[in-house]
Amino acid sequence: MMFWRIFRLELRVAFRHSAEIANPLWFFLIVITLFPLSIGPEPQLLARIAPGIIWVAALLSSLLALERLFRDDLQDGSLEQLMLLPLPLPAVVLAKVMAHWMVTGLPLLILSPLVAMLLGMDVYGWQVMALTLLLGTPTLGFLGAPGVALTVGLKRGGVLLSILVLPLTIPLLIFATAAMDAASMHLPVDGYLAILGALLAGTATLSPFATAAALRISIQ
């Protein structure tokens, strides 16, 4: 099926640029590490501010990685070829965003036990953090994809991309950190996780169409 061929191709291309994959991950880890060094190793304080630290770091690292979502395709001319495929352009966008999450969002999940240890979180807090990252990091990709498509042809589109995308991430940031706060106090988190799941379902449904329209505008 052409969808999965595009997905596998995107993964292969991403792994050829391993440095661009590693940079956001290093940024995420460095930001997480700086907080215990700057405010001290007090476990209660670190656990209290951990939700905000983790999600701001995840948001900023995802913005670093988002810029290359369509940039390489535009530079080598393959973006126009993707638009001519018999597969609908929203499906192509969906495959690209999924592959992008596999190489940028999934590693954050793998690093989550280390992050929990650095910030003094308990096992339940780590489990909820991992769930928020599982639901929230692909949502970040879907929220950012239309902005990337609109700015892909600009030489210095990074600042404009941040201005476009950051306001859209505020609800995600609120509910993800609220879920982790509730977990730290051993309160129910099902409602917060349900909202995060709804945000993921909504963005995964609507974002490919908005991104496809933005790509057509940028190419023209």
Swiss-Prot record:
Compartment list: Cell inner membrane
One GO MF term: heme transmembrane transporter activity
ATP-binding is among the record's keywords: no
Coiled coil: none
Main location, first listed in the record: membrane
A Gene Ontology BP annotation from the UniProt entry: cytochrome complex assembly
Bilayer-spanning residue ranges: 21-41, 45-65, 101-121, 128-148, 159-179, 193-213
Keyword Nucleotide-binding: no
Protein name as it appears in the record: Heme exporter protein B
Species: Escherichia coli (strain K12)
